[in-house]
Amino acid sequence: MSKIYEDNSLTIGHTPLVRLNRIGNGRILAKVESRNPSFSVKCRIGANMIWDAEKRGVLKPGVELVEPTSGNTGIALAYVAAARGYKLTLTMPETMSIERRKLLKALGANLVLTEGAKGMKGAIQKAEEIVASDPQKYLLLQQFSNPANPEIHEKTTGPEIWEDTDGQVDVFISGVGTGGTLTGVTRYIKGTKGKTDLITVAVEPTDSPVIAQALAGEEIKPGPHKIQGIGAGFIPGNLDLKLIDKVVGITNEEAISTARRLMEEEGILAGISSGAAVAAALKLQEDESFTNKNIVVILPSSGERYLSTALFADLFTEKELQQ
């Protein structure tokens, strides 16, 4: 029987779960989200936020989409917008990689860069300004608070993990950007499937430990870091703090070195936030109580999206970089 997708947004999901054989003790299972249509976990939310807006009747011909992004959500929205015929404007901190900017332009998006020091807050503020200038023309999708974000992970990512492990998942690890992956997957496994002993682990940069601060009842003090895609510097509306059992902080260096290990030792092209998530799994395995647990880790994106970043900074001589 033939299987033809009516447009490329419909091809999200069903990404492979791969056992790591040389990193860790063989119980770390990596969900390789770079196998999505625009090569990151954000393809899922990019598609669902647009589908949801269409269903609700707020997105129709003539309406233009606007969204702040650190890169991967923007790329996901850009490919879905192109596939379904919408115009898209994205606001993004100027510190994000040049590869992301090029991909956004290639997919037809209008890109507005914001001050790097202001982080995602600056990008969000700019997006809100654009929409306020003409609310009838522009629609802000709001990935950080849009319920369509965790919903798609509850409907797809969670069930995929459950089915691929036959329900034998003990620990779920996710870096936190919008919080949608962690929230949606945990809701499905702990709620729908009733596995209340699942240990859900949030990963964030040690340089911007806002989740740990929030859970401890401390003042939120974000800071700059180099782990693109996680650590937005605030607690997103889509992050359900009640679902988190443990928070692991990862340094820039740990994230980068582990991403390199994934490429060199496991043959998995992995981005910086993927390195952070696996580094968190390795930290857990230092505790004997985690030795025999099946640990599922989300690898959000491919290393190819970070060629101009610190991930590849010292791998080539100047001569090797000449064309």
Swiss-Prot record:
O-acetyl-L-serine causes the CysE-CysK complex to dissociate in the absence of hydrogen sulfide. Its cofactor is pyridoxal 5'-phosphate. Its EC number is 2.5.1.47. PROSITE patterns: CYS_SYNTHASE. Keywords: Allosteric enzyme, Amino-acid biosynthesis, Cysteine biosynthesis, Pyridoxal phosphate, Transferase. The modification N6-(pyridoxal phosphate)lysine is found at K42. Gene3D superfamilies: 3.40.50.1100. It is an enzyme of class 2 (transferase). Pyridoxal 5'-phosphate binds at N72, G177, T178, G179, G180, T181, S273. One of its GO terms (cellular component) is cytoplasm. Pathway: Amino-acid biosynthesis; L-cysteine biosynthesis; L-cysteine from L-serine: step 2/2. Belongs to the cysteine synthase/cystathionine beta-synthase family. This is Cysteine synthase A. It comes from Salmonella typhimurium (strain LT2 / SGSC1412 / ATCC 700720).
